[in-house]
Amino acid sequence: NTLLINDKSSLGGSTIYQDDQNYKINEKISSDWLNNEINNLKNKENLTILNRTSLAAYHSYNFLLARENISDHKSLHERSNQLRQRLWKIRAKKVILATGAIERPLIFNNNDRPGVMLANSVKKYIDYYGVRCGNKNVIFTNNDTAYETALSLNKKGLNVSVIDIRKNSSSILAQSAKENGIKIYWN
C-alpha cells in the first residue's frame, strides 16, 4: 500500500497555474496531462491520496506523523459535527520526499526584505491568487522558467525586465518574452 501525502487542496503543484499555451507534457496540454494523471492515480487500488495533509515529523525507522485537515477549510456551518483533523501515525517500508522545489534563492545581503521573492512564488501570486507583487519587476535567472513569470507579469500590464546570467537562450519562452517587449539583459 502507498500513501501520497500532499499539503495542498489538490494535486498538481505549479502545473495547476501554468500557461497551457507554452507547456506540453508528453505532447499533451499540461492541464489535460495533469487531469489524466490524477484520474489514473485515483483509480489505483493500493494508493491512498491525502490532500490537505502535512507531514509533521519523520522519526527513526521511517516512522512518520502527518496531520490531515478534514474540515478546517469549510465554514462553521458546513463542518458542524465533523472531525476537524486526523493524526496519521505511519510506519513505512520506504519514504520518498518529493518537495517539488526546483528554484533556488539568490544569496545576498537583505534578500529577505519585502519585495524580494522567488520567481515561481510571484507567478503563483499573480496567476493563481490574482495578486500583484509590485508594478516594476526585475527577474534574475539562470534558466528559462523565470520567463514564465515575466510573461505572466507582462500579460497583467506590469513592467518587467529579466536579467539572465547566461549568454543567451533560444527557448520558446525567451523568444516569446522578446516578442512581447520584455527587456532581457544577458551576461
What are these regions (language model features)?
Residues 1-187:
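Residues forming the flavin
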